[in-house]
A protein has these predicted regions:
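Short, well-ordered loop/turn sites that connect or cap secondary structure elements
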Residues: 2-3
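C-terminal terminal-subdomain/extension
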Residues: 60-110
Length: 110
């Protein structure tokens, strides 16, 4: 199943989380062992947190949503059910920045 960073997929996240939209955040690497994909889940519960990035109602999302980077996870590629669409590059940059901040990957400024 072909997937790219910035795409939104409907994914089976297991019994507790059920099926929900996720943003793919890992690179497409056909040589990677394990066939896993990293994702950030979307939710409609906006807590106004630095761990969340707001998404407007896009054509493939029926409600305003937020990407919750604290929910970063991995699933087998086989659990991606169908591609819904792609978020704009400017929003993906905000998701990547929020992930870098949450994981303390920001480089100190000199």
């Amino acid at each position: 199943m072909d997937h790219q960073p910035g795409e939104v997929w409907l994914a089976d996240l297991g019994l507790a989380a059920k099926t929900r939209p996720v943003i793919i955040v890992s690179r497409r690497d056909p040589n990677a062992p394990g066939a896993l994909v990293l994702y950030v889940p979307l939710t409609t519960q906006d807590r106004q947190s630095r761990y969340e990035v707001s998404l407007p109602r896009l054509g493939f999302l029926d409600r305003d949503s937020v990407a919750n980077v604290q929910g970063l996870g991995s699933i087998p590629i086989a659990r991606l059910e169908r591609k819904l669409g792609r978020i704009p590059n400017q929003i993906m940059s905000k998701v990547q920045s929020a992930l870098a901040w949450a994981l303390d990957l920001e480089t100190p400024s000199n």
